[in-house]
Amino acid sequence: MRQLLPGDTVWRNIRLATMDPQRQAPYGLVDNQALIVRGGHICDIVPETQLPVSGDNIHDMQGRLVTPGLIDCHTHLVFAGNRAAEWEQRLNGASYQHISAQGGGINATVSATRACAEETLYLLARERMMRLASEGVTLLEIKSGYGLELATEEKLLRVAAKLAAENAIDISPTLLAAHATPAEYRDDPDGYITLVCETMIPQLWQKGLFDAVDLFCESVGFNVAQSERVLQTAKALGIPVKGHVEQLSLLGGAQLVSRYQGLSADHIEYLDEAGVAAMRDGGTVGVLLPGAFYFLRETQRPPVELLRRYQVPVAVASDFNPGTSPFCSLHLAMNMACVQFGLTPEEAWAGVTRHAARALGRQATHGQIRAGYRADFVVWDAEQPVEIVYEPGRNPLYQRVYRGKIS
């Protein structure tokens, strides 16, 4: 009989999808198990028969499914306003250029966000965060990028920090100052990149406001040379990097990010075999964002088969943002990744657990249920993990556990 220490908490009588690749069963499944939690971490996984029949802090889950807490590794959660009218214009035939000339596009969100009070931004972001948490998300990446000036980029990162401090969720904040060229630098994008590299990155890093630097390397974003300046600046300061790359065209952004051992290359619809090989060599995770693919009615799919062949880890994320992926649902992203991109349900689950953790540099502590990892997990009214992927809109979450506490 397993002896429990005072303060231990146990979840017993569970079907456990560990997502541990060392377990041979699909999803790392093991039946009739119990989880022992101590000090906010998983202490042990033991067979049900090794536990006392009852006791304090022992929760009987009556055979329910338990998985790691979900991880959304790519979001733009903090912004003001929406772009619904712009979307309607596009569907009525207006071009992106026409909408931009009217003040639409990303700079519309930038203007609204700059004008928005910090507390209002917090309340807007918290409501979105709670929607994700209600689906079982326990770790969430949040990018800046709707400030495009020092003061507002800092404001967005402070909101992310407050979300982490005041709610039962982990936040991984990312500086995405190199998201777009702001209106005041329209004719001088190189000058804006200088501002990013010489002012924003070092000053905001010194304040401890972010974990990684991101950029948008694309024909409608920044070119390879401009992107490399951002990567060089970050790496010189010891900051992990990642990139929005190969979404609308093939510029070689994935190879560039991988040369700097990037945490992830995101979107990657136009990724080629050389880029896939570079990602393998750089230890870079591929992050699929099917919401943007769907919303923009794109047709070029990511090279999933090449990613499998080169054994590049693949994550899946919501990319929640007002312009190209207004879907605040990781369950929906999992379903879309299967239906649109051809992932298996097990690959989609890996994409929101252990591979998403790797995309955030948290693979040693998050994304699996195993001894020593954080006690962030979800209890579902379901028998199989595929049920959560299969039916978006139905949420069978029974219990969300964060740092060993029911939340």
Swiss-Prot record:
It is found in: Cytoplasm. Its EC number is 3.5.2.7. Keywords: Cytoplasm, Histidine metabolism, Hydrolase, Iron, Metal-binding, Zinc. Its main location: cytoplasm. Fe(3+) binds at residues 74, 76, 244, 319. GO terms for cellular component: cytoplasm. This is Imidazolonepropionase. The keyword Ligase does not apply. Zn(2+) binds at residues 74, 76, 244, 319. It catalyses: 4-imidazolone-5-propanoate + H2O = N-formimidoyl-L-glutamate. It comes from Salmonella schwarzengrund (strain CVM19633). Its cofactor is Zn(2+); Fe(3+).
